[in-house]
Amino acid sequence: MLDRNASVDEGLAPAGATPTLDDLPRRLADFDTLGEALDYAARGVRGVNFHDARGNLAEAYPFARMRDDALAHARRFIGLGIAPGDRVALIAETGPDFAACFFGAVYAGAWPVPLPLPTSFGGRDAYVDQLSIQLDSCDPALFLFPAELADMARAAAAKRKIDARAWESFAALAQSDAELPSASPDDIAYLQYSSGSTRFPHGVAVTHRQLLQNLHGHGFGLQVVETDRVISWLPWYHDMGLVGCLLSPVAMQMTVDYLKTEDFARRPLAWLDMITRNPGTSVSYSPTFGYDICSRRMSSQTRAEDRFDLSRWRIAGNGADMIRPDVMQAFVDSFAEAGFEASAFCPSYGLAEATLAVSLMPPGEGIRLELVEENELSGGEPDDEERPRRYRAVVNCGKPVAGMHIEIRGASDEILPERGIGKVYVRGTSVMHSYFRDEESTRACLSADGWLDTGDMGYMSKGYIFIVGRAKDMIIINGRNHWPQDIEWAVEQLPGFKSGDIAAFAITGPSGEETPAVLVHCRVSDPEERGKLRDDIRERVRAITGITPVVELVPPRTLPRTSSGKLSRTKARHLYLSGEIQPYDIAA
Protein backbone atom coordinates (compact mmCIF):
# COMPACT_ATOMS: atom_id res chain seq x y z
CA MET A 1 0.00 0.00 0.00
CA LEU A 2 1.01 3.61 -0.56
CA ASP A 3 2.91 5.31 2.27
CA ARG A 4 1.58 8.86 2.34
CA ASN A 5 4.43 9.97 4.59
CA ALA A 6 7.10 8.68 2.24
CA SER A 7 10.00 10.97 1.46
CA VAL A 8 10.33 12.35 -2.05
CA ASP A 9 13.33 11.50 -4.20
CA GLU A 10 13.56 14.74 -6.18
CA GLY A 11 16.28 13.07 -8.24
CA LEU A 12 13.55 11.26 -10.17
CA ALA A 13 12.20 14.57 -11.45
CA PRO A 14 13.70 16.19 -14.57
CA ALA A 15 16.64 18.49 -13.81
CA GLY A 16 15.44 22.06 -13.45
CA ALA A 17 11.79 21.23 -12.71
CA THR A 18 10.08 23.00 -9.83
CA PRO A 19 10.18 20.77 -6.74
CA THR A 20 7.44 18.77 -5.07
CA LEU A 21 8.32 19.78 -1.52
CA ASP A 22 8.48 23.29 -0.08
CA ASP A 23 9.06 24.85 3.34
CA LEU A 24 6.12 27.19 2.73
CA PRO A 25 3.22 26.03 4.95
CA ARG A 26 0.39 24.56 2.89
CA ARG A 27 -2.87 26.52 2.72
CA LEU A 28 -5.95 24.92 1.17
CA ALA A 29 -7.34 27.86 -0.80
CA ASP A 30 -8.26 29.86 2.32
CA PHE A 31 -7.80 33.21 0.56
CA ASP A 32 -10.16 36.09 -0.16
CA THR A 33 -9.18 36.45 -3.82
CA LEU A 34 -7.37 34.52 -6.53
CA GLY A 35 -4.67 37.21 -6.68
CA GLU A 36 -3.94 36.65 -2.98
CA ALA A 37 -3.60 32.92 -3.69
CA LEU A 38 -0.87 33.52 -6.30
CA ASP A 39 0.81 36.10 -4.02
CA TYR A 40 1.13 33.40 -1.37
CA ALA A 41 2.20 30.59 -3.71
CA ALA A 42 4.92 32.87 -5.12
CA ARG A 43 6.57 33.00 -1.68
CA GLY A 44 7.59 29.36 -2.12
CA VAL A 45 9.66 27.40 -4.64
CA ARG A 46 6.92 25.34 -6.26
CA GLY A 47 5.46 26.04 -9.68
CA VAL A 48 4.40 24.50 -12.98
CA ASN A 49 6.41 22.62 -15.59
CA PHE A 50 5.67 22.32 -19.29
CA HIS A 51 6.71 19.16 -21.12
CA ASP A 52 7.18 18.29 -24.78
CA ALA A 53 5.37 15.62 -26.78
CA ARG A 54 7.52 12.86 -25.27
CA GLY A 55 6.97 14.06 -21.73
CA ASN A 56 10.42 15.66 -21.38
CA LEU A 57 10.75 18.96 -19.52
CA ALA A 58 10.58 21.96 -21.87
CA GLU A 59 10.21 24.82 -19.38
CA ALA A 60 9.91 25.26 -15.63
CA TYR A 61 7.73 28.17 -14.50
CA PRO A 62 7.88 28.85 -10.75
CA PHE A 63 4.89 30.56 -9.18
CA ALA A 64 7.17 33.49 -8.27
CA ARG A 65 7.96 34.10 -11.94
CA MET A 66 4.31 33.61 -12.90
CA ARG A 67 3.35 36.34 -10.42
CA ASP A 68 6.03 38.73 -11.70
CA ASP A 69 4.87 38.22 -15.29
CA ALA A 70 1.21 38.55 -14.29
CA LEU A 71 1.79 41.84 -12.47
CA ALA A 72 3.67 43.20 -15.49
CA HIS A 73 0.80 42.15 -17.76
CA ALA A 74 -1.73 43.73 -15.39
CA ARG A 75 0.02 47.06 -15.88
CA ARG A 76 0.00 46.52 -19.65
CA PHE A 77 -3.75 45.87 -19.53
CA ILE A 78 -4.27 49.09 -17.60
CA GLY A 79 -2.04 50.91 -20.08
CA LEU A 80 -4.39 49.80 -22.86
CA GLY A 81 -7.34 51.22 -20.96
CA ILE A 82 -8.65 47.89 -19.67
CA ALA A 83 -10.86 48.65 -16.66
CA PRO A 84 -12.22 46.42 -13.88
CA GLY A 85 -15.08 44.33 -15.25
CA ASP A 86 -13.80 44.41 -18.84
CA ARG A 87 -13.35 41.03 -20.46
CA VAL A 88 -10.01 39.79 -21.80
CA ALA A 89 -10.42 36.80 -24.13
CA LEU A 90 -7.49 34.38 -24.17
CA ILE A 91 -6.85 31.36 -26.37
CA ALA A 92 -6.18 28.76 -23.68
CA GLU A 93 -2.90 27.33 -24.93
CA THR A 94 -1.12 25.27 -22.28
CA GLY A 95 1.92 27.42 -21.58
CA PRO A 96 3.30 30.32 -19.55
CA ASP A 97 1.82 33.01 -21.82
CA PHE A 98 -1.78 32.06 -21.06
CA ALA A 99 -1.10 31.55 -17.34
CA ALA A 100 0.55 34.97 -16.98
CA CYS A 101 -2.15 36.75 -19.01
CA PHE A 102 -4.95 35.02 -17.08
CA PHE A 103 -3.58 36.11 -13.72
CA GLY A 104 -2.60 39.49 -15.15
CA ALA A 105 -6.23 40.11 -16.05
CA VAL A 106 -7.22 39.07 -12.52
CA TYR A 107 -4.74 41.52 -10.96
CA ALA A 108 -6.08 44.27 -13.26
CA GLY A 109 -9.65 43.59 -12.14
CA ALA A 110 -10.62 42.39 -15.63
CA TRP A 111 -12.35 39.08 -16.29
CA PRO A 112 -10.21 36.58 -18.21
CA VAL A 113 -12.20 34.43 -20.63
CA PRO A 114 -10.48 31.19 -21.75
CA LEU A 115 -11.39 30.20 -25.31
CA PRO A 116 -10.69 26.84 -26.98
CA LEU A 117 -7.86 25.79 -29.21
CA PRO A 118 -8.73 24.31 -32.62
CA THR A 119 -9.44 20.58 -32.60
CA SER A 120 -8.44 17.93 -35.09
CA PHE A 121 -12.00 17.86 -36.42
CA GLY A 122 -14.18 20.62 -37.82
CA GLY A 123 -11.63 22.55 -39.88
CA ARG A 124 -10.64 26.21 -40.05
CA ASP A 125 -14.03 27.72 -40.85
CA ALA A 126 -15.78 25.87 -38.02
CA TYR A 127 -13.14 27.07 -35.55
CA VAL A 128 -13.36 30.68 -36.71
CA ASP A 129 -17.15 30.50 -36.38
CA GLN A 130 -16.87 29.07 -32.87
CA LEU A 131 -14.46 31.82 -31.79
CA SER A 132 -16.67 34.48 -33.38
CA ILE A 133 -19.74 33.29 -31.48
CA GLN A 134 -17.91 33.20 -28.15
CA LEU A 135 -16.28 36.59 -28.77
CA ASP A 136 -19.70 37.99 -29.55
CA SER A 137 -21.01 36.50 -26.31
CA CYS A 138 -18.27 37.76 -23.96
CA ASP A 139 -17.74 41.13 -25.74
CA PRO A 140 -14.05 41.49 -24.82
CA ALA A 141 -12.02 44.68 -24.76
CA LEU A 142 -8.96 42.66 -25.85
CA PHE A 143 -8.29 39.28 -27.45
CA LEU A 144 -4.89 37.57 -27.03
CA PHE A 145 -3.65 34.44 -28.80
CA PRO A 146 -0.55 32.44 -29.78
CA ALA A 147 1.14 33.68 -32.96
CA GLU A 148 0.63 30.38 -34.80
CA LEU A 149 -3.15 30.91 -34.60
CA ALA A 150 -3.01 34.54 -35.73
CA ASP A 151 -4.79 33.95 -39.04
CA MET A 152 -7.84 32.27 -37.50
CA ALA A 153 -7.91 34.47 -34.40
CA ARG A 154 -7.81 37.70 -36.41
CA ALA A 155 -10.49 36.40 -38.78
CA ALA A 156 -12.77 35.78 -35.80
CA ALA A 157 -11.95 39.13 -34.18
CA ALA A 158 -12.45 41.10 -37.40
CA LYS A 159 -16.18 40.34 -37.41
CA ARG A 160 -16.57 42.49 -34.27
CA LYS A 161 -13.57 44.79 -34.73
CA ILE A 162 -11.99 43.55 -31.51
CA ASP A 163 -8.44 44.57 -30.56
CA ALA A 164 -6.61 41.28 -31.23
CA ARG A 165 -2.92 40.71 -30.49
CA ALA A 166 -0.46 37.82 -30.32
CA TRP A 167 1.15 37.06 -26.93
CA GLU A 168 4.51 38.47 -28.04
CA SER A 169 3.02 41.69 -29.36
CA PHE A 170 1.17 42.29 -26.10
CA ALA A 171 4.24 41.47 -23.97
CA ALA A 172 6.23 44.15 -25.81
CA LEU A 173 3.88 46.94 -24.69
CA ALA A 174 4.92 49.48 -22.07
CA GLN A 175 3.62 49.06 -18.53
CA SER A 176 1.43 51.65 -16.88
CA ASP A 177 2.60 53.02 -13.53
CA ALA A 178 -0.99 53.26 -12.30
CA GLU A 179 -1.91 51.56 -9.03
CA LEU A 180 -3.53 48.15 -9.43
CA PRO A 181 -7.16 47.93 -8.29
CA SER A 182 -8.03 45.97 -5.17
CA ALA A 183 -10.41 43.04 -5.52
CA SER A 184 -13.14 41.89 -3.16
CA PRO A 185 -14.32 38.29 -2.68
CA ASP A 186 -17.63 38.90 -4.45
CA ASP A 187 -16.09 40.41 -7.58
CA ILE A 188 -16.19 38.28 -10.72
CA ALA A 189 -12.86 36.46 -11.13
CA TYR A 190 -13.34 34.98 -14.63
CA LEU A 191 -15.83 33.71 -17.21
CA GLN A 192 -15.87 30.00 -18.05
CA TYR A 193 -17.74 28.72 -21.09
CA SER A 194 -19.54 25.50 -20.30
CA SER A 195 -18.52 22.47 -22.35
CA GLY A 196 -20.23 22.11 -25.69
CA SER A 197 -21.59 25.65 -25.75
CA THR A 198 -20.73 26.67 -29.30
CA ARG A 199 -23.95 27.65 -31.07
CA PHE A 200 -25.60 29.17 -27.97
CA PRO A 201 -22.70 29.83 -25.59
CA HIS A 202 -23.19 30.17 -21.86
CA GLY A 203 -20.45 32.14 -20.13
CA VAL A 204 -20.45 31.14 -16.47
CA ALA A 205 -19.54 34.11 -14.25
CA VAL A 206 -17.56 32.92 -11.20
CA THR A 207 -16.62 35.13 -8.25
CA HIS A 208 -13.41 34.87 -6.22
CA ARG A 209 -15.39 33.60 -3.23
CA GLN A 210 -17.19 30.91 -5.24
CA LEU A 211 -13.94 29.72 -6.81
CA LEU A 212 -11.94 29.56 -3.60
CA GLN A 213 -14.76 27.93 -1.62
CA ASN A 214 -14.94 25.20 -4.24
CA LEU A 215 -11.17 24.73 -4.33
CA HIS A 216 -11.07 24.52 -0.53
CA GLY A 217 -13.78 21.84 -0.54
CA HIS A 218 -12.02 20.00 -3.36
CA GLY A 219 -8.64 20.06 -1.61
CA PHE A 220 -10.16 19.00 1.70
CA GLY A 221 -11.96 16.14 -0.05
CA LEU A 222 -8.78 14.96 -1.79
CA GLN A 223 -6.94 14.94 1.56
CA VAL A 224 -3.98 16.70 -0.05
CA VAL A 225 -0.59 15.65 1.36
CA GLU A 226 2.84 17.29 1.14
CA THR A 227 4.18 14.78 -1.38
CA ASP A 228 1.35 15.37 -3.87
CA ARG A 229 2.22 16.61 -7.35
CA VAL A 230 -0.33 17.19 -10.13
CA ILE A 231 0.14 15.66 -13.60
CA SER A 232 -2.22 16.92 -16.30
CA TRP A 233 -2.93 16.85 -20.03
CA LEU A 234 -6.38 18.44 -19.68
CA PRO A 235 -7.11 21.59 -21.72
CA TRP A 236 -7.29 24.90 -19.90
CA TYR A 237 -10.45 25.95 -21.72
CA HIS A 238 -12.38 23.24 -19.86
CA ASP A 239 -13.29 23.62 -16.19
CA MET A 240 -11.53 20.43 -15.09
CA GLY A 241 -8.31 21.59 -16.76
CA LEU A 242 -8.50 25.28 -15.81
CA VAL A 243 -9.95 25.08 -12.31
CA GLY A 244 -8.81 21.61 -11.31
CA CYS A 245 -5.31 21.65 -12.77
CA LEU A 246 -4.22 25.32 -12.86
CA LEU A 247 -6.17 27.44 -10.39
CA SER A 248 -6.39 24.69 -7.77
CA PRO A 249 -2.62 24.01 -7.69
CA VAL A 250 -1.97 27.75 -7.35
CA ALA A 251 -4.47 28.05 -4.49
CA MET A 252 -3.03 24.95 -2.77
CA GLN A 253 0.65 25.53 -3.70
CA MET A 254 1.08 22.26 -5.60
CA THR A 255 3.67 21.70 -8.30
CA VAL A 256 2.22 20.64 -11.66
CA ASP A 257 3.62 18.86 -14.72
CA TYR A 258 1.75 19.59 -17.96
CA LEU A 259 1.55 17.67 -21.23
CA LYS A 260 -0.28 19.54 -23.97
CA THR A 261 -3.65 18.05 -24.88
CA GLU A 262 -2.70 17.61 -28.54
CA ASP A 263 0.49 15.80 -27.48
CA PHE A 264 -1.52 13.47 -25.26
CA ALA A 265 -3.79 12.70 -28.22
CA ARG A 266 -0.76 11.66 -30.29
CA ARG A 267 1.21 9.91 -27.54
CA PRO A 268 -1.15 9.12 -24.63
CA LEU A 269 1.33 6.88 -22.84
CA ALA A 270 3.59 9.91 -22.33
CA TRP A 271 1.07 10.85 -19.61
CA LEU A 272 1.87 7.63 -17.75
CA ASP A 273 5.60 8.15 -18.36
CA MET A 274 5.31 11.50 -16.55
CA ILE A 275 3.47 9.88 -13.65
CA THR A 276 6.22 7.24 -13.51
CA ARG A 277 8.91 9.94 -13.28
CA ASN A 278 7.03 11.89 -10.60
CA PRO A 279 9.13 11.71 -7.44
CA GLY A 280 6.12 12.27 -5.19
CA THR A 281 2.56 11.02 -5.06
CA SER A 282 0.57 11.76 -8.21
CA VAL A 283 -2.79 13.49 -8.45
CA SER A 284 -4.01 13.20 -12.04
CA TYR A 285 -7.46 13.44 -13.58
CA SER A 286 -8.94 12.27 -16.86
CA PRO A 287 -12.31 11.65 -18.44
CA THR A 288 -13.06 8.01 -19.15
CA PHE A 289 -11.78 8.19 -22.71
CA GLY A 290 -8.26 9.07 -21.52
CA TYR A 291 -7.99 5.82 -19.57
CA ASP A 292 -9.52 3.97 -22.52
CA ILE A 293 -6.93 5.30 -24.98
CA CYS A 294 -4.05 4.26 -22.72
CA SER A 295 -5.38 0.73 -22.30
CA ARG A 296 -5.83 0.34 -26.04
CA ARG A 297 -2.29 1.57 -26.76
CA MET A 298 -0.77 -1.24 -24.73
CA SER A 299 0.09 -4.09 -27.06
CA SER A 300 -0.06 -7.70 -25.97
CA GLN A 301 3.72 -7.89 -26.42
CA THR A 302 4.41 -4.97 -24.04
CA ARG A 303 4.80 -5.57 -20.31
CA ALA A 304 3.54 -2.55 -18.39
CA GLU A 305 6.00 -3.07 -15.53
CA ASP A 306 8.93 -2.82 -17.96
CA ARG A 307 8.04 0.81 -18.76
CA PHE A 308 5.87 2.23 -15.99
CA ASP A 309 5.81 2.57 -12.22
CA LEU A 310 2.33 3.73 -11.22
CA SER A 311 2.59 2.68 -7.58
CA ARG A 312 2.76 6.32 -6.38
CA TRP A 313 -0.41 7.37 -8.23
CA ARG A 314 -2.50 8.36 -5.20
CA ILE A 315 -5.51 10.03 -6.90
CA ALA A 316 -6.57 8.80 -10.36
CA GLY A 317 -9.51 11.11 -10.84
CA ASN A 318 -12.47 10.34 -13.09
CA GLY A 319 -14.82 13.07 -14.22
CA ALA A 320 -16.14 15.36 -16.98
CA ASP A 321 -18.10 12.51 -18.59
CA MET A 322 -20.08 9.38 -17.76
CA ILE A 323 -17.75 6.96 -16.00
CA ARG A 324 -17.55 3.56 -17.71
CA PRO A 325 -16.88 0.68 -15.29
CA ASP A 326 -15.71 -1.61 -18.11
CA VAL A 327 -13.13 0.95 -19.27
CA MET A 328 -11.83 1.46 -15.74
CA GLN A 329 -11.50 -2.30 -15.26
CA ALA A 330 -9.62 -2.59 -18.55
CA PHE A 331 -7.19 0.06 -17.31
CA VAL A 332 -6.62 -1.86 -14.08
CA ASP A 333 -6.08 -5.06 -16.07
CA SER A 334 -3.52 -3.30 -18.28
CA PHE A 335 -1.54 -1.51 -15.57
CA ALA A 336 -1.91 -3.41 -12.29
CA GLU A 337 1.41 -5.12 -12.96
CA ALA A 338 2.98 -1.63 -13.12
CA GLY A 339 1.81 -0.96 -9.57
CA PHE A 340 -1.49 0.77 -10.29
CA GLU A 341 -4.06 0.17 -7.55
CA ALA A 342 -7.77 0.22 -8.35
CA SER A 343 -8.36 2.00 -5.03
CA ALA A 344 -6.61 5.06 -6.52
CA PHE A 345 -9.62 5.74 -8.76
CA CYS A 346 -11.51 8.77 -7.51
CA PRO A 347 -14.86 9.28 -9.28
CA SER A 348 -16.33 12.76 -9.09
CA TYR A 349 -19.21 14.81 -10.38
CA GLY A 350 -19.15 18.47 -11.29
CA LEU A 351 -20.03 21.14 -13.81
CA ALA A 352 -18.86 24.63 -14.73
CA GLU A 353 -22.04 26.13 -13.25
CA ALA A 354 -20.88 24.85 -9.84
CA THR A 355 -17.33 26.17 -10.48
CA LEU A 356 -15.91 22.62 -10.67
CA ALA A 357 -16.68 19.95 -8.07
CA VAL A 358 -20.08 18.97 -6.71
CA SER A 359 -19.10 15.59 -5.30
CA LEU A 360 -15.99 13.51 -4.78
CA MET A 361 -15.36 9.92 -3.78
CA PRO A 362 -13.29 9.78 -0.58
CA PRO A 363 -9.69 8.78 -1.46
CA GLY A 364 -9.01 5.08 -1.22
CA GLU A 365 -12.60 3.94 -1.84
CA GLY A 366 -12.08 3.47 -5.58
CA ILE A 367 -14.92 2.81 -7.99
CA ARG A 368 -18.08 1.46 -6.41
CA LEU A 369 -21.03 0.29 -8.47
CA GLU A 370 -24.69 -0.41 -8.05
CA LEU A 371 -26.65 -2.57 -10.47
CA VAL A 372 -29.91 -0.81 -11.25
CA GLU A 373 -32.74 -2.54 -13.10
CA GLU A 374 -33.36 -0.94 -16.49
CA ASN A 375 -36.99 -0.31 -15.68
CA GLU A 376 -36.07 1.83 -12.67
CA LEU A 377 -33.78 3.93 -14.85
CA SER A 378 -36.44 4.41 -17.50
CA GLY A 379 -39.18 5.29 -15.01
CA GLY A 380 -41.45 2.60 -16.40
CA GLU A 381 -43.80 0.13 -14.79
CA PRO A 382 -42.50 -3.29 -13.75
CA ASP A 383 -41.87 -5.59 -16.67
CA ASP A 384 -43.59 -8.86 -17.33
CA GLU A 385 -42.09 -11.22 -14.74
CA GLU A 386 -41.33 -13.73 -17.50
CA ARG A 387 -39.18 -11.27 -19.41
CA PRO A 388 -35.44 -11.37 -18.52
CA ARG A 389 -34.43 -8.37 -16.44
CA ARG A 390 -31.66 -6.10 -17.69
CA TYR A 391 -29.42 -4.11 -15.40
CA ARG A 392 -27.00 -1.24 -15.80
CA ALA A 393 -23.98 -0.64 -13.58
CA VAL A 394 -24.18 2.90 -12.19
CA VAL A 395 -21.02 4.45 -10.75
CA ASN A 396 -20.96 6.05 -7.31
CA CYS A 397 -19.73 9.65 -7.80
CA GLY A 398 -18.98 10.29 -4.15
CA LYS A 399 -20.21 12.64 -1.46
CA PRO A 400 -20.92 16.36 -1.79
CA VAL A 401 -17.81 18.49 -1.28
CA ALA A 402 -17.79 20.89 1.66
CA GLY A 403 -20.32 23.68 1.20
CA MET A 404 -22.36 21.83 -1.45
CA HIS A 405 -25.85 20.36 -1.03
CA ILE A 406 -27.70 18.02 -3.40
CA GLU A 407 -31.42 17.33 -3.87
CA ILE A 408 -33.10 14.89 -6.24
CA ARG A 409 -36.44 16.15 -7.54
CA GLY A 410 -39.31 14.58 -9.43
CA ALA A 411 -41.37 15.83 -12.37
CA SER A 412 -43.46 18.08 -10.11
CA ASP A 413 -40.37 19.51 -8.37
CA GLU A 414 -41.01 17.37 -5.29
CA ILE A 415 -37.98 16.13 -3.35
CA LEU A 416 -37.60 12.40 -3.94
CA PRO A 417 -36.77 9.87 -1.24
CA GLU A 418 -33.57 7.84 -1.00
CA ARG A 419 -32.83 6.02 -4.29
CA GLY A 420 -35.57 7.87 -6.16
CA ILE A 421 -34.31 8.72 -9.66
CA GLY A 422 -34.92 12.29 -10.75
CA LYS A 423 -33.31 15.60 -11.68
CA VAL A 424 -30.18 16.61 -9.78
CA TYR A 425 -30.30 20.03 -8.10
CA VAL A 426 -27.35 21.55 -6.23
CA ARG A 427 -26.93 24.55 -3.97
CA GLY A 428 -23.85 25.87 -2.26
CA THR A 429 -21.24 28.53 -1.81
CA SER A 430 -19.63 27.80 -5.18
CA VAL A 431 -22.70 27.69 -7.43
CA MET A 432 -22.27 30.25 -10.20
CA HIS A 433 -23.18 33.91 -9.94
CA SER A 434 -25.00 33.87 -13.31
CA TYR A 435 -24.64 33.31 -17.01
CA PHE A 436 -22.99 36.42 -18.43
CA ARG A 437 -25.58 38.80 -19.93
CA ASP A 438 -28.16 36.02 -20.16
CA GLU A 439 -30.83 36.57 -17.53
CA GLU A 440 -33.31 34.26 -19.23
CA SER A 441 -30.97 31.25 -19.21
CA THR A 442 -29.89 32.07 -15.66
CA ARG A 443 -33.51 32.13 -14.42
CA ALA A 444 -34.23 28.89 -16.28
CA CYS A 445 -31.68 26.92 -14.25
CA LEU A 446 -30.97 28.96 -11.10
CA SER A 447 -33.76 29.65 -8.60
CA ALA A 448 -34.02 32.75 -6.44
CA ASP A 449 -33.02 30.70 -3.38
CA GLY A 450 -29.86 29.42 -5.08
CA TRP A 451 -30.81 25.93 -6.30
CA LEU A 452 -29.21 25.04 -9.64
CA ASP A 453 -30.93 22.63 -12.02
CA THR A 454 -27.93 20.70 -13.36
CA GLY A 455 -29.85 19.03 -16.19
CA ASP A 456 -28.54 15.67 -14.98
CA MET A 457 -30.52 12.70 -13.70
CA GLY A 458 -29.46 10.66 -10.71
CA TYR A 459 -30.25 9.44 -7.21
CA MET A 460 -28.84 9.60 -3.69
CA SER A 461 -27.98 6.58 -1.57
CA LYS A 462 -26.46 6.75 1.92
CA GLY A 463 -25.07 10.21 1.27
CA TYR A 464 -23.51 9.35 -2.10
CA ILE A 465 -24.64 10.67 -5.49
CA PHE A 466 -25.16 8.37 -8.49
CA ILE A 467 -25.49 10.00 -11.94
CA VAL A 468 -27.44 8.09 -14.60
CA GLY A 469 -27.47 10.52 -17.54
CA ARG A 470 -28.45 13.89 -19.04
CA ALA A 471 -32.17 14.65 -19.01
CA LYS A 472 -32.05 16.29 -22.45
CA ASP A 473 -30.44 13.18 -24.00
CA MET A 474 -33.28 10.87 -22.95
CA ILE A 475 -34.91 8.99 -25.83
CA ILE A 476 -38.65 8.50 -25.21
CA ILE A 477 -40.32 5.77 -27.26
CA ASN A 478 -43.92 4.66 -26.67
CA GLY A 479 -43.85 6.43 -23.31
CA ARG A 480 -40.76 4.55 -22.21
CA ASN A 481 -37.45 6.25 -21.45
CA HIS A 482 -34.18 4.96 -22.89
CA TRP A 483 -30.73 6.27 -22.08
CA PRO A 484 -28.59 6.84 -25.20
CA GLN A 485 -25.46 5.58 -23.47
CA ASP A 486 -27.14 2.21 -22.89
CA ILE A 487 -27.71 1.91 -26.64
CA GLU A 488 -24.20 3.14 -27.43
CA TRP A 489 -22.54 0.81 -24.95
CA ALA A 490 -24.48 -2.17 -26.32
CA VAL A 491 -23.28 -1.43 -29.86
CA GLU A 492 -19.70 -0.95 -28.62
CA GLN A 493 -19.67 -4.59 -27.54
CA LEU A 494 -19.56 -5.58 -31.21
CA PRO A 495 -15.99 -6.17 -32.49
CA GLY A 496 -13.99 -3.19 -33.76
CA PHE A 497 -15.66 -0.36 -31.84
CA LYS A 498 -14.38 1.93 -29.12
CA SER A 499 -15.79 4.65 -26.91
CA GLY A 500 -16.99 7.59 -28.99
CA ASP A 501 -17.74 5.55 -32.12
CA ILE A 502 -21.52 5.59 -31.63
CA ALA A 503 -24.06 8.38 -31.14
CA ALA A 504 -27.68 7.55 -30.29
CA PHE A 505 -30.53 10.06 -30.26
CA ALA A 506 -34.20 10.35 -31.15
CA ILE A 507 -35.61 11.53 -34.48
CA THR A 508 -39.18 11.94 -35.65
CA GLY A 509 -40.38 9.22 -38.02
CA PRO A 510 -42.63 9.71 -41.08
CA SER A 511 -45.77 9.19 -38.99
CA GLY A 512 -44.68 11.62 -36.26
CA GLU A 513 -43.50 8.94 -33.84
CA GLU A 514 -40.11 9.10 -32.10
CA THR A 515 -37.57 6.60 -33.42
CA PRO A 516 -34.05 5.88 -32.18
CA ALA A 517 -31.31 6.82 -34.63
CA VAL A 518 -27.82 5.42 -34.25
CA LEU A 519 -24.80 6.85 -36.08
CA VAL A 520 -21.79 4.55 -36.11
CA HIS A 521 -18.19 5.06 -37.21
CA CYS A 522 -17.55 2.40 -39.85
CA ARG A 523 -14.05 1.19 -40.71
CA VAL A 524 -15.23 -1.55 -43.08
CA SER A 525 -14.99 -0.91 -46.83
CA ASP A 526 -16.65 -4.03 -48.25
CA PRO A 527 -20.34 -3.24 -49.10
CA GLU A 528 -21.53 -6.68 -48.04
CA GLU A 529 -19.73 -6.42 -44.69
CA ARG A 530 -21.22 -2.98 -44.15
CA GLY A 531 -24.70 -4.35 -44.73
CA LYS A 532 -24.11 -7.16 -42.25
CA LEU A 533 -22.73 -4.72 -39.68
CA ARG A 534 -25.77 -2.48 -40.03
CA ASP A 535 -28.09 -5.46 -39.52
CA ASP A 536 -26.16 -6.59 -36.43
CA ILE A 537 -26.40 -3.11 -34.93
CA ARG A 538 -30.09 -2.90 -35.74
CA GLU A 539 -30.76 -6.14 -33.88
CA ARG A 540 -28.75 -4.99 -30.87
CA VAL A 541 -30.73 -1.78 -30.59
CA ARG A 542 -34.06 -3.49 -31.22
CA ALA A 543 -33.32 -5.85 -28.32
CA ILE A 544 -33.00 -2.84 -26.01
CA THR A 545 -35.75 -0.53 -27.29
CA GLY A 546 -38.22 -2.94 -28.84
CA ILE A 547 -38.27 -0.75 -31.97
CA THR A 548 -36.39 -1.04 -35.26
CA PRO A 549 -33.95 1.90 -35.26
CA VAL A 550 -32.49 3.98 -38.05
CA VAL A 551 -28.86 2.85 -38.30
CA GLU A 552 -26.42 4.94 -40.31
CA LEU A 553 -22.78 4.02 -40.90
CA VAL A 554 -20.56 7.09 -41.22
CA PRO A 555 -16.85 7.64 -41.95
CA PRO A 556 -14.44 7.54 -38.98
CA ARG A 557 -13.92 10.86 -37.15
CA THR A 558 -17.31 12.14 -38.33
CA LEU A 559 -19.09 12.32 -34.98
CA PRO A 560 -18.59 15.73 -33.32
CA ARG A 561 -17.14 16.26 -29.88
CA THR A 562 -17.30 19.06 -27.37
CA SER A 563 -14.29 21.21 -26.51
CA SER A 564 -13.47 18.75 -23.70
CA GLY A 565 -13.46 15.75 -26.05
CA LYS A 566 -16.87 14.34 -25.12
CA LEU A 567 -19.24 13.02 -27.75
CA SER A 568 -21.85 15.68 -28.58
CA ARG A 569 -25.13 13.89 -29.29
CA THR A 570 -26.98 17.19 -29.69
CA LYS A 571 -24.60 18.39 -32.38
CA ALA A 572 -24.52 14.95 -34.06
CA ARG A 573 -28.32 15.04 -34.31
CA HIS A 574 -28.27 18.56 -35.73
CA LEU A 575 -25.60 17.73 -38.32
CA TYR A 576 -27.41 14.54 -39.33
CA LEU A 577 -30.81 16.19 -39.75
CA SER A 578 -29.29 19.12 -41.66
CA GLY A 579 -27.55 16.74 -44.06
CA GLU A 580 -24.04 17.80 -43.01
CA ILE A 581 -23.26 14.24 -41.92
CA GLN A 582 -23.31 12.01 -44.98
CA PRO A 583 -23.79 8.29 -44.18
CA TYR A 584 -22.46 5.55 -46.42
CA ASP A 585 -24.89 4.33 -49.07
CA ILE A 586 -25.93 0.77 -48.19
CA ALA A 587 -28.42 -1.37 -50.05
CA ALA A 588 -31.56 -2.19 -48.06
Where are these regions (language model features)?
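Conserved pre-ATP/AMP-binding loop-to-beta segment of ANL
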Residues: 46, 175-193, 199-200, 210, ...
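AMP-binding/adenylate-forming catalytic core of the ANL superfamily
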Residues: 276, 284, 295, 428, ...
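Conserved AMP-binding/adenylation subdomain of ANL enzymes
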Residues: 212-229, 239-282, 297-303
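Conserved C-terminal "lid"/linker of ANL adenylate-forming enzymes
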Residues: 501-506, 517-518, 538-588
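Conserved AMP-binding/adenylate-forming core of the ANL superfamily
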Residues: 49-103, 120-127, 180-182, 203-212
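N-lobe entry segment of adenylate-forming
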Residues: 1-61, 65-80, 84, 98, ...
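Conserved AMP-binding/adenylate-forming
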Residues: 314-316, 323-464, 472-474
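ANL superfamily adenylate-forming
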Residues: 55, 120-124, 128-134, 139-186, ...
